[in-house]
Amino acid sequence: MMSETSWQSDVVDYITKTRFAVLGYVRGDRTLLLRSMGSFALSGFDLYFSSGKDAPKVREIEKNPQVSFFFEHDNQNLETWKSVLVLGRAKLLTTGTEYENAIELLSNRNPHFKERVAKGEMVNTAIFKIKTQEIEYLDYSKGFGTVNKYQLS
């Protein structure tokens, strides 16, 4: 098992260096849906992400807030393959300090998002916070098939 600080810094570093991730959520008819996401940012191990306000996923996540976010870099070698899976509950943010913090973090990470903020387009944007409950960190450099699971709450 990895040391507490080692896995934490490895996971934060890996997520920070990931350009696109995959959001997993369950639709009302219990079908699992996956969506590529480029607008996300970490706050500790919790995660903010944005979407078009009218996107069907916004309504579906409000109904069933249990979601996952999968991070995997392109062009990896199998011997050193890594990925991170974040599992938690998503909450729609609309106002307040946490909402403002999310906008700042998303703007710092994503120039396109920052541009939308500058143009006053936030009225068309939904901002979510995932309260991370579990992290799965796959790291084949520690042995083929090595997946460490960490419960956060």
Question: Language-model segments: which ranges?
Answer:
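Charged, gly/pro-rich active-site loop segments
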Residues: 2-3, 82-153
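A generic "binding-loop/recognition-motif" signal
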Residues: 53-54, 133
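Alpha-helix boundary recognition
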Residues: 15-16, 62, 107
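Short, surface-exposed beta-strand-loop junctions and turns on beta-sheet-rich folds
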Residues: 55-57, 76, 143-145
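Short beta-strand segments
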Residues: 19-53, 61, 67-73, 81-84
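Extreme N-terminal tail/first-helix region
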Residues: 1-21, 148-150
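Activation segment
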Residues: 51, 58-59, 94, 139
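Generic structural signal for secondary-structure transition and capping sites
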Residues: 19-20, 66, 111, 135
